[in-house]
């Protein structure tokens, strides 16, 4: 895995590999010796802002905010598919098999300062001292990436730490002089309150300045500036002096090298992990070891120095988090299907670590939440009990991430909280409550340009169960951080070659859009060819119907499934309009009679031209889909399609009769019909047999199928009712789930209270549906088929969660444009 590194005497190309805890390999990023100034060292083809999409058109479209026009997209797709797509996939596949970490000059310097036990004048790790001597940039600094054109607080901190390490062992006087000169030239950055700072910079940097002065080093800066930083440090310490929370103690232990003799070392070592480290952080462990001898801590550092040949990363081990982050990125960008076997291997290893309560997962809030979410959604049996330590806000605040109010950790646990599969999952519900509130507070307290703000806003507005996959993919591609580094105590560079991920995702999305546009053109022709556009009563929503299929069944080979989904969804809407608002009773009865016969009628059998148009379109479309599906399945499935249509239309007729007679059914009677009449069962079944899975004969008679349908139908019916009640009541329609609950209460329940009750039922059904879909137990219905029910549920949540998106002419326009029409516009990386 190629990540930018610092220069090293060994030259580029050498890797220091070893077995990682969760499988695969972990290696240190390669580096080169003594580059000139801050130009990229030999062997690096460009800085971190380069985009490695080799097609010129693709590169132009992916950087600089240029629009990717349709002809360009087609050319890019052809070029990438022909010459580079396989290379991109091979590169990503290799990255998934092993993790490469960035060298950390800051952490290496602190490890270098650990004295040899019994000989305080000698280093325990002379290899680290050698690495520092061999890896100074020509401007005098030490940093991960010498191609950075400007200094920052992280580079200042790393440079001062390296200077202290060399001075401690009285070597490298010229290196020290140049390092101090770099610090002096750029010291104004340390005084800038607005500059991005590593975690604990206000504690560790002044402490290092004091250590430098105490060891006889003359830092070429004004004493007033040093005094000012020390004063701010003392204020920070005094402000928290009365805070004895576990989170505060964790923070002090994490900054062990900066707090030094202010710490109670016996208390600090309570945070030591089984591998001997403090927080898997070499600098924290070295800071403790310099003041408190511990054999396990020494062994931890020794293992890292040996493993990485004299240099250490800023965190280790980090394998599980790195690999899960890559899996998450692939899923979020819509390209995970190309790496199914690699992802399964990663998740299998993660699950084994989960069951073994591996500290790399359990002691890191972000990793634990991400592991839970990815494992659950991929069918592994995981319990939210393992998240009980952050069930309340106080538990989160007791962690290091909680004390730091870490945005990424809060967002991760919030997203995870929405993956509940039981209405009694109090842990996830509690996590969702406090983390959602905290995210809203972050939005209020931070400006509009705050990093990650758009991601937080999206997560709060659209829980994962009310999103369409292709919409999410586009958002993540557009917002993708190709640099991807994370600022800890020092900068931690990305764990994978982000450009490869972005290049493949852009290519895949552009190909998809081209397919979608062609398929939508076909559907619009289908509407006209079948004269469906002549139906005055019907909502002309073929684009929205296609959106729901395209945004979920998005793989290129699923084109026929998408168009079948869209045509079926549109026909259910048309027939619903015929029974609900646009048709005479005789027309409704005539259509049902024709469907029950299911044969080509004579001209005199149609009550009206509208019935003729509707039935002919339905008859021809269902038979066509049925023939295609039957050929794929090896047995007749047309009968299932006809039967489900009959069930839907009969329920529509029952509800039409209720409306004409002003009959108010019980809520239970209404739901028995209503969860069918919405028509999702027809839509799902139209694609069920077309996605490449072999299904048993009699599938619709299975108990599991019936339960999947019931739960999906319940969500759909009630979501539709809760958003349509005002409109339907104004039209004089009383057969609505909310209205029926109010009526059944005898006036004791208000409309708002009835809506709350309906939302509870939706929530319970959705959770139960998800539990069936992600169940580890393999039943007769393959998981990809069960996922169609879940995807339909998500579509219904998006369409109806906040408004009646299907009936509103404007609500879905932006979604249609984003998935189908608008070219990608990527930010300058």
From Swiss-Prot:
Polar residues: compositionally biased ranges: 23-37
Note on cofactor: Binds 3 Mg(2+) ions per subunit.
Binding annotation for Mg(2+) 1: 576, 580
Keyword Ribosomal protein applies: no
InterPro entries referenced in this protein's UniProt entry, alphabetically: Isoprenoid_synthase_dom_sf (IPR008949), Terpene_cyclase_plant_C1 (IPR044814), Terpene_synth_N (IPR001906), Terpene_synth_N_sf (IPR036965), Terpene_synthase-like (IPR050148), Terpene_synthase_metal-bd (IPR005630), Terpenoid_cyclase/PrenylTrfase (IPR008930)
UniProt KW rRNA-binding keyword: no
Region of interest called Disordered, as start-end residue ranges on this chain: 1-50
Family assignment from sequence similarity: Belongs to the terpene synthase family.
Note: Ent-cassa-12,15-diene is a precursor of the phytoalexins phytocassanes A-E. Phytoalexins are diterpenoid secondary metabolites involved in the defense mechanism of the plant and produced in response to attack (by a pathogen, elicitor or UV irradiation).
Main function: Involved in phytocassane phytoalexins biosynthesis. Catalyzes the conversion of ent-copalyl diphosphate to the phytoalexin precursor ent-cassa-12,15-diene.
Protein name: Ent-cassa-12,15-diene synthase
